[in-house]
Amino acid sequence: MTNLPKVTVRDLAESGVHFGHKISRWNAKIAPYIYGVHQENRIHIIDLRKTLPLLQVAMKVLYDVAFQGGRILFVGTKFQAFDIIASEAIRCGQYYVNHRWLGGMLTNWGTVSSSIKTLMQYEKILNDEDSILTKKELGNIEKKKQKLDKALGGIREMGAIPDILFIIDTNKEHIAVKEAKKLGIPIVAILDTNSDPDGITYLIPGNDDSRKSIELYCKLATDSILAGIESSLAKSGVKIDDIRGDEFIQEKEDGIVQTKRRRSKVYKEEEREVVTNEDESR
């Protein structure tokens, strides 16, 4: 029995998930998930009775991937989402892209891996107390390091292409969608009334612009992933009470899921609040 987070139609409504775009901006393919039109504002209203079961399916999928030790990549680069994407991905020990998606991030993974190695080399140089480089040279390396870290920091420990993507706004992240489709990587995505559902493996009709809505989606995704990890740990005989201060990951070795412990990247609530506030001043 899975221990998925609970969510109701009321929860969705209170977070504004039902508010779509102006009717002039709609994508006709999303029509099956539209309830009607708000006559005063002339925006489409999303049918939350259809959103809820699709959301629950997506949550179960994320749970299953996490249970099997899969890699999950959170993608959301729009201003309303970028800090939420990072903090929630980190909270469950997964990976994220929250600034510009670089073309080939999935389809040219070899080059991306090389760039990640370069990033780590820069960090090693900058942390070398015995470095003979000049202040100017170190400054140039610091700038290059910051640029790479902004683009790749959220996937530096991913190790390989992800098993599934969780995307906020498929229109903005169309390159990520295209690359995932090309490689056959499943996609869980929030689709607003101006979005194309074609090729999205697990779609969730909903408002992809409201921070409150985005916070709800990401929290549910993260809680589902954590539930999957905890169930996997319990099956491995690890006591959940013992994982405080540590992060457990599941890695596949020779077809077998191995449970390993590594330094936690999970924010404490107070730490997350500080980071979020700093990001919002961007």
UniProtKB/Swiss-Prot annotation:
GO MF annotation list: structural constituent of ribosome
Listed Gene3D superfamilies: Glucose-6-phosphate isomerase like protein, domain 1, Helix hairpin bin
Keywords tagged on the record: Ribonucleoprotein, Ribosomal protein
Transmembrane annotation, as ranges: none
InterPro entries in UniProt: Ribosomal_uS2 (IPR001865), Ribosomal_uS2_bac/mit/plastid (IPR005706), Ribosomal_uS2_CS (IPR018130), Ribosomal_uS2_flav_dom_sf (IPR023591)
GO biological process: one example: translation
Residue numbers spanned by region Disordered: 260-282
Listed GO CC annotations: cytosolic small ribosomal subunit
Intrachain S-S bonds: none
Biased composition (Basic and acidic residues): 266-282
Family as reported in the entry's similarity comment: Belongs to the universal ribosomal protein uS2 family.
UniProt protein name: Small ribosomal subunit protein uS2
Provenance organism: Wolbachia sp. subsp. Drosophila simulans (strain wRi)
Lineage of producing organism: Bacteria, Pseudomonadati, Pseudomonadota, Alphaproteobacteria, Rickettsiales
